[in-house]
């Protein structure tokens, strides 16, 4: 049988050992064997495992919400972008959540970050530490669906981290005059105390408003407040805090460290004497609440408050926080953490990283009363912290100068709801360290006296107006923890944001200037926003290259008006005709495509429609065009018209449209359904002679530019475009919808089906599914007719896809299906996205980025993974015994590295500046044409092969299966580790990369040896017939 060509050779049979086969019978395997199997392949924690993972000195990211680019794109596409989105109503800083998620889904990470930072200057910090389950995620409408709510925090973190990697500075609002030309009020002295989230937010917004004399006074030698000193590195890295502070400093805000609000240094009275017009108090709550039973206990004996412990951990683990280097607190044995808030859980998980053997989280009430967010509680549970509810501390037991145990009494809730302590029920817990996390207060008399004469409430905190954040002293404002209303970082940020507007209002009033009663907060700007994306085509200047196609978004002129108000650069009217050709539509007529599979809701890859041209009269459209041009003179408005093959009709209608004031005309010669039966649309657009003549007639009738709208339903679209040019057309639109039949139901009836007869017809397919057809048409016309203007349409749904059409030779871009999927506001995403894509081309340091996508590092679930192969010379997957082995190797590596930390200076952010000119739209038009050609022009000598990154591989075997049954059997799949290995028989076909679910897990690299095709039989062998 060895000579049988149609059977796999023995070596191939060996490769195919794990390839799926059709099952011919049920499978039998013993329960005992299956339990062993389960253990080998297990990826989550074994419920029978009670040992703690060694976490000492491991400050790697532990958040479940963290996302890589793949995860972010999948999650963003899932979002419904709801009309009156509840998530946005639940965000303290009122983030435009659905819009920034739209930008992420469209790979416009700059646009997403711009939206986030516009409402929240600490958008990256909040993306990492926000209790989203209680805020935005808590209101997500997808809670009502099987797949559950959107990971909003992870998306926010991802977009802002990508922006952070761009190293682009923040700039002042471009519409403001230079600082030296601003009114005198904007140079007023403003002081802020405490460099935490509330003050950073307040100062950022004041600087965006135009104020130039803003100083933050911070008593510590580091900045960031609790974000730096108390939120652990594994939840919030210091470089994130530093990045947001540097963004603030980009606007000229000054920070002076080592200066505190105290009678010993600075007071409100001294500020006023020194000419400060406004002050903001954002000092937090600096002293810990401490139970009387801890009097006299110190760190030497093993007692810490959270205010002692967490800053010590931070100084050791947060590189760049300060110039000094200090070791982690030496924690051994059992640790008791008292409290049930977020801080208590931070103490617990940090204690494990300081060497604790076991951690007990003890709290007075039950699990249902835990104040910490579920995310924090779940992480502590996963790290094997023990939870002990219903216990109130009574006594600390010290022996030989060291804590050895604590005594508690049981608590319970009585019938009236009050909590009582039962002194008869006592519990004694052995412990080596006790950490108290019972909250914080403002008690320092020197600080309180320095705040005089502001009033304090019954909790000893500054009394403020909750709407303005103004204290009893009109020029003094306060926010954050010190006010007692903000319980989270994001609420502190909003306090600062809120205060900034009323500080602005107060200062302006002092100078006799009024401000709007409705706050108008300034946005976040960078040099990207200065990029010019206007473009000229056929003598017309388009404000930006994005416009409404002659389709459903242009059903009426009020819709076009709203589109122009939203920022669209141009629009086409819905195609209209002479009254004698007026139409009436059927219904149903616009349906979702089947190309998206079982994806319902927004994000459809295609639609099919059997809608005809506009049902409205030519008079309606012409009157409306006149109105719109009067109100939007800078926007381009193109009238789309259609007639049968009749010279007088075309001349009459085109003159009518020109007289209305339309900037240009589009001749619809391509409607693929319905109109062709009337001798219009497709009936005219498939014959070059008819197209040429119609264009000649219109050229004789009008002076304004006109464009022929072409159909892709022809063999040679170039011949149609050439005919249009020969007829005098100023350009073409490529392309209209593709004729198709979307699907049939199980009973054989079509959808859409009209009337009781369930009739249908071939319709027009639109959306991203037809983008390859449209790109082919645009590039073919651009190559054949250089310089001939092309209006592209067909699957444009983002700045990235729009740039593809510009690179293909189009000058402007028409959009329809993407608006059907969302709404007119997507234009903001398209414009910021295109500006970013152009701007990034000017930065040498980002030359290895793919648009707005940075190079992907080896990661699992969005978190960088140590390359275990480099640590021990062995490749290990991330499941079962191999996962346990990986954890041990990484733990040992972290302990080895802990003593290698060296002192370092505070981090300095380096801006990436443009080294090359920022390309204009005209510079990128047709850029890709140089790469297109015939098959014979491609090299058969420069071959590639697949290279798999085992650290990123999730061991699914999709590459293996497609190579076996659709390729060349060049991938081996280990039966124990499920690690795929590419053999030297790889032909570089790239199918494996195409089906791999993990971005950049497989790369195609240059082949090191000459490629020798397998011919089956030598070329000299003749066939046997």
Curated annotation (Swiss-Prot):
Enzyme class: oxidoreductase
Modification N6-acetyllysine occurs at: 384
Binding site for [4Fe-4S] cluster 4: 986, 989, 992, 996
Annotated residues for binding of FAD: 129, 194-198, 218-226, 235, 261, 480-489
GO CC terms in record: cytoplasm; cytosol
Pathway(s) per entry: Amino-acid biosynthesis; beta-alanine biosynthesis
Cofactor note: Binds 2 FAD. Binds 2 FMN.
Activity control mechanisms: Inactivated by 5-iodouracil.
Subunit (UniProt): Homodimer.
Function recorded in the entry: Involved in pyrimidine base degradation. Catalyzes the reduction of uracil and thymine. Also involved the degradation of the chemotherapeutic drug 5-fluorouracil.
Protein's recorded name: Dihydropyrimidine dehydrogenase [NADP(+)]
Source organism per UniProt: Mus musculus (Mouse)
């Amino acid at each position: 049988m060895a000579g049988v060509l149609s059977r796999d050779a023995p070596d191939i049979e060996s490769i195919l050992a794990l390839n799926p086969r059709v099952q011919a019978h049920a499978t039998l395997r013993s329960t005992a064997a299956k339990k062993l199997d389960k253990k080998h392949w297990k990826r989550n924690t074994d419920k029978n495992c009670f040992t703690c993972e060694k976490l000492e000195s491991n400050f790697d990211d532990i958040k479940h919400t963290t996302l890589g680019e793949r995860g972010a794109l999948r999650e963003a596409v899932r979002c419904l972008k709801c009309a009156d989105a509840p998530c946005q109503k639940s965000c303290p800083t009122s983030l435009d959540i659905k819009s920034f998620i739209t930008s992420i889904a469209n790979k416009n990470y700059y646009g997403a970050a711009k939206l986030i930072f516009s409402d929240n200057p600490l958008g990256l910090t909040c993306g990492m530490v926000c209790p989203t389950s209680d805020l935005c995620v808590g209101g997500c409408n997808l809670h009502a669906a099987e797949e559950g709510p959107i990971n909003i925090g992870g998306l926010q973190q991802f977009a802002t981290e990508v922006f952070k990697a761009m190293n682009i500075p923040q700039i002042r609002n471009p519409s403001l005059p230079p600082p030296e030309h601003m009114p005198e009020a904007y140079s007023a002295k403003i002081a802020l105390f405490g460099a935490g989230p509330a003050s950073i937010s307040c100062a950022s917004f004041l600087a965006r408003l135009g104020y130039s004399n803003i100083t933050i006074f911070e008593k510590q030698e580091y900045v960031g407040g609790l974000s730096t000193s108390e939120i652990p590195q594994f939840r919030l890295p210091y470089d994130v805090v530093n990045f947001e502070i540097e963004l603030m400093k980009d606007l000229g805000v000054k920070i002076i460290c080592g200066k505190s609000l105290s009678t010993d240094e600075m007071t409100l009275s001294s500020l006023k004497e020194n000419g400060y017009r406004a002050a903001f108090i954002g000092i937090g709550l600096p002293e810990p609440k401490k139970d009387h039973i801890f009097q006299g206990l110190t760190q030497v004996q093993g007692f810490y408050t959270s205010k002692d412990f967490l800053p010590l951990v931070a100084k050791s683990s947060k590189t760049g926080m300060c110039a000094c280097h200090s070791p982690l607190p030496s924690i051994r044995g059992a640790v008791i953490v008292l409290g049930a808030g977020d801080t208590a859980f931070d103490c617990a998980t940090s204690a494990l990283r300081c060497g604790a053997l076991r951690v007990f989280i003890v709290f007075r009430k039950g699990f249902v009363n835990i104040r910490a967010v579920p995310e924090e509680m779940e992480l502590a549970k996963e790290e094997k912290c023990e939870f002990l509810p219903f216990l109130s501390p009574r006594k600390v037991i010290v022996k030989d100068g060291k804590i050895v145990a604590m005594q508690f009494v049981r608590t319970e809730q009585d019938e009236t709801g009050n909590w009582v302590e039962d002194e008869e029920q006592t519990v004694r817990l052995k412990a080596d360290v006790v950490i108290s996390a019972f909250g914080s207060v403002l008690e320092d008399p020197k600080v309180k006296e320095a705040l005089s004469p502001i009033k304090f409430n019954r909790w000893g905190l500054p009394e403020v107006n909750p709407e303005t954040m103004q204290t009893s002293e009109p020029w003094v404002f306060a926010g954050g923890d010190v006010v007692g209303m903000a319980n989270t970082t994001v609420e502190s940020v909003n306090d600062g944001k809120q205060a900034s507007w009323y500080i602005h209002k107060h200062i302006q009033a002092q100078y006799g200037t009024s401000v709007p009663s409705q706050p108008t907060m300034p946005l976040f700007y960078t040099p990207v926003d200065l990029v010019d994306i206007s473009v000229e085509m056929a003598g017309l200047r388009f404000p930006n290259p994005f416009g409404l196609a002659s389709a459903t978004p242009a059903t009426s002129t009020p819709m076009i008006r709203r589109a122009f108000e939203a920022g669209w650069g141009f629009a086409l009217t819905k195609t209209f005709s002479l009254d004698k050709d007026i139409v009436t539509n059927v219904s149903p007529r616009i349906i979702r495509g089947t190309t998206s599979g079982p994806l319902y809701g927004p994000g459809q890859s295609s639609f099919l429609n059997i809608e005809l041209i506009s049902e409205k009269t030519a008079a309606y459209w012409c009157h409306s065009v006149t109105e719109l041009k009067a109100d939007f003179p800078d926007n381009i408005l193109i009238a789309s018209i259609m007639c049968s093959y009749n010279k007088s009709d075309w001349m009459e209608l085109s003159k009518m449209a020109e007289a209305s004031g339309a900037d240009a005309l589009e001749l619809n010669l391509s409607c693929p359904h319905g109109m062709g039966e009337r001798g219009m649309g497709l009936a005219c657009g498939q014959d070059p002679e008819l197209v040429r003549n119609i264009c000649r007639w219109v050229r004789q009738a009008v002076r304004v530019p006109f464009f022929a709208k072409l159909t892709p339903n022809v063999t040679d679209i170039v011949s149609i475009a050439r005919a249009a040019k020969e007829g005098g057309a100023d350009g073409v639109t490529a392309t209209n919808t593709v004729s198709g039949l979307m699907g049939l139901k199980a009973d054989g009836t079509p959808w859409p089906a009209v009337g009781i007869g369930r009739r249908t017809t071939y319709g027009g397919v639109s959306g991203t599914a037809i983008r390859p057809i449209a790109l082919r048409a645009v590039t073919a016309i651009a190559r054949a007719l250089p310089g001939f203007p092309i209006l592209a349409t067909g699957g444009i749904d983002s700045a990235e896809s729009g740039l593809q059409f510009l690179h293909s030779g189009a000058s402007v871009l028409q959009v329809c299906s993407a608006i059907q999927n969302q709404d007119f506001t997507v234009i903001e995403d398209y414009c910021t996205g295109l500006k970013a894509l152009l701007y990034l081309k000017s930065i040498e340091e980002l030359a290895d980025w793919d648009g707005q996508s940075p190079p992907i590092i080896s990661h699992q679930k969005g978190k960088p993974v140590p390359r275990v192969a480099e640590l021990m010379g062995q490749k290990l997957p991330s499941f079962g015994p191999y996962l346990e082995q990986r954890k041990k190797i990484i733990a040992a590596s972290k302990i080895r590295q802990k003593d290698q930390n060296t002192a370092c200076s505070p981090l300095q952010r380096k801006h990436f500046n443009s080294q090359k000119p920022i390309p204009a739209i005209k510079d990128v038009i047709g850029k890709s044409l140089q790469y297109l050609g015939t098959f014979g022009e491609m090299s058969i000598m420069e071959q590639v092969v697949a290279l798999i990154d085992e650290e990123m591989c999730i061991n699914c075997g999709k590459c293996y299966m497609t190579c076996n049954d659709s390729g060349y059997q060049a991938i081996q799949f280990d039966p124990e580790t499920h690690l795929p290995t590419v053999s030297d028989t790889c032909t570089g076909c790239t199918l494996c990369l195409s089906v791999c679910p993990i971005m950049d897990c497989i790369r195609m690299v240059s082949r090191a040896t000459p490629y020798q095709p397998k011919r089956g039989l030598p070329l000299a062998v003749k066939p046997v017939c």
